[in-house]
């Protein structure tokens, strides 16, 4: 035999090393296949290699038992068992009911139903829940006495695999969502044409006046960007000649727009940053219109002087119970209109109330100077413009409450979960299904509130439409009657009218808040609120809609934060992109 070359030796070593490795892995059969595919040199010379059979022994597979067996395969007979008789009776009963249902198809329906109960199959035309719907009156009366069985029957229908209601449910959910998104302002044209019996002679002329309002034409709304981020607060300055609009956003920017400035081709807008967090409220004192006050979640209230062009801090609230500098986020501010116009009221996200005289320097607050009005966030509050000691608050706890600041004590806070709190006397409250977003008070003692229950509620405390005495005559211990004596805060305030309005703003749109016009020059009390269909709705204090302001071509977003000029019937709304829509 000729000696092997170096290359052949290396090749044989590689083959042997691979065989050893495969043998360790218990893959000898794979080694044989490799050997057959790559014959060695001796095979090329005609010498045959002894065939080895080291293949692993096959594992005997046991037949897999079925997880379920029928009674027939198991050899079980059912004819004489109680279970078989029960099944047979059920089948006979089902056949009988089927014949009755065929007969009932030609009769009218009895009782009330959900829409899903009346859905029919698109191919056959039969009701998908005909067994539930097609019943005689005596059967309905019988089932009314056993609501539990009815509920179980409904669940059985909804869980029936033979009934496909997925597509129908989607359609009905769409209809439901559309119903939730409807607002009365969406049907302004229809409501206007159907309200000819309204006894107010000025209603039609007032609607005509608002119908003539158009978007500010000098600039494209896309160019009127007053803040960098989503607008959270807006204020229409009372000036009628040189109009000024201010707006704040969620990061503390404050934009000022000189509406009637003609010096530049672009809108005369200046954006400041007086706050570190979201601006909650902007207001202009009636007694000093050259100043603008703003509050924010950073705990500060600042004064902007238009004459001096200065911004100064008026109040900084920090938690008196904390050793470190922990700010109390200010959620709303208002100035007294009756009595002393220099007193500023404010509320916090923690449910507190605080008041400060602007003529005196601010000092660090003490624990007993904070009043407890709610245990949760106060999103909005208002002052009775006729009596400054009466305020109303709207809270995340699903209520709005009316308070008397003349009667303050610890005993008034027994309702609170917090200890050693001080509260004013509460006249009563209104309870909502969901959070109450805002409340506002006008000169004729009407209050308007709205919240996430998709309603606008108007309350009459002037005694014109209720048996209660006028709110201005309530004593500091007055409380309307309540049926439940265990209620620490009675739910005794009822609205005299309720308006359907979509308030589901979601995450990216600011909360909708209804606001009265402060001093209407035409003498008609009215409030404005944004409409989720990219518009502004205006109502009078009777709940009659006066206008639905929009422009389908130019209004590109929801003007969620809305305000009216204090005197003139001009409206402005701010969007999530920091843009303004002015109707004049």
From Swiss-Prot:
GO terms for cellular component: chromatin; cytoplasm; nuclear periphery. WD repeats lie at residues 226-267, 274-314, 373-413, 431-469, 506-549, 553-584. One of its GO terms (molecular function) is DNA binding. Keywords: Coiled coil, DNA damage, DNA-binding, Repeat, WD repeat. PROSITE patterns: WD_REPEATS_2 (PS50082), WD_REPEATS_REGION (PS50294). SUPFAM superfamilies: WD40 repeat-like (SSF50978). InterPro entries: WD40/YVTN_repeat-like_dom_sf (IPR015943), WD40_repeat_dom_sf (IPR036322), WD40_rpt (IPR001680), WD_repeat_DNA-damage-binding (IPR050853). Residues 59-68 have a biased composition (Basic and acidic residues). It comes from the Eukaryota. Residues 76-110 form a coiled coil. GO terms for biological process: DNA damage response; regulation of DNA damage checkpoint. Gene3D superfamilies: YVTN repeat-like/Quinoprotein amine dehydrogenase. Residues 29-44 have a biased composition (Polar residues). Residues 29-90 are annotated as: Disordered. DNA-binding protein that binds to both single- and double-stranded DNA. Binds preferentially to UV-damaged DNA. May be involved in DNA-metabolic processes. Belongs to the WD repeat DDB2/WDR76 family. This is DNA damage-binding protein CMR1. It comes from Debaryomyces hansenii (strain ATCC 36239 / CBS 767 / BCRC 21394 / JCM 1990 / NBRC 0083 / IGC 2968).
